[in-house]
Amino acid sequence: MTTTTTATTAKAPAPGETVLDARGVTMRFGGLTAVRSVDLTVKSGEIVGLIGPNGAGKTTFFNCLTGLYIPTEGEVRYKGQVLPPKSFKVTAAGIARTFQNIRLFSNMTVLENVLVGRHTRTKEGLWSALLRGPGFHKAEAASRARALELLEFVGLAAKADHLARNLPYGEQRKLEIARALASEPGLLLLDEPTAGMNPQETRATEELVFAIRDMGIAILVIEHDMRFIMNLCDRVAVLVQGQKLIEGDGPTVQRDERVIAAYLGEPFEGEPGEAEAAEVAAAEEAADAAAEADAETDADAEADAEADAEADAEAEADAGTSGAEADAESDADADADGDTDRTTDPTTTAEASGAKGSGKENDS
């Protein structure tokens, strides 16, 4: 089914348990501080906005929450448990995210992209995949069914077999959200989900986010579209120069003079200059590159491990086959030797007969 919830009729459910609890999160790159002592909580069924001028540290904070960066100070808890400093483990724990720049597998189909998001919820391992037994086929069918449900949910079911690169921009954004939902998260982080969208696409995204909220999923969203944020969010936190300036409901935040000054460009005391801001941006880019390299290394190591396991399985199978063939050949040789022993050689028989005849003549 496609989403039909609207912003004007959507009613937020009562917030449930605390899903995200970030305390004193600080991120430094060398001597530069991009995020400074930020506290933030998000409850299930709640939508929280994170806003601020460019370079305020919003995406850096997201990266600290999702394991792409390891915070210099502070801790991040998900449902009371401290999150491990690896992005794939954070995803497995129950946190999913989208990115500012769309990151889809462009040469894969829409359905295949969503199936990629299911891997953290698939219990079948390497051996099950190699043997392709009943358990593997059952899990594969369940993943496919769930992926199709999610495509229906975001309105892309009719394009399941299309290549991702052929989708319009707005639909690619929806696909990225569907892939994030495929991991069955308890917390969804959206980084500028309406960037580059027209008003109609923005409205559709708003409805989609409300529908996700109604599923009981907590949502933390970064966005520059203030109308979108104020319509959508139960609470809004403002970051300026890496620090949380204020947190509250939409009207309270909009009236705050410090927020107005930040967006109008009025300087704050101790505000970094352009050179320092450029250094922070360069440090973040270097950290992103290092994080991506680590992710690729982890993926390569996992692929090598799978290849080694597959090679061991093939070697074991070959050894079993060779051993069986050797045993069969040995048994055949033994049978042949037995038959030879039981078969009387004609020459030997003749000699034996002659000896017997000679004995009779001598007796005579």
Q: What function would you assign to each model-found segment?
A:
Residues 1-26, 268-319, 324-329, 333, ...:
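ABC-family P-loop ATPase nucleotide-binding domain
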Residues 2-284:
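Glycine-rich phosphate-binding loops of nucleotide-dependent enzymes
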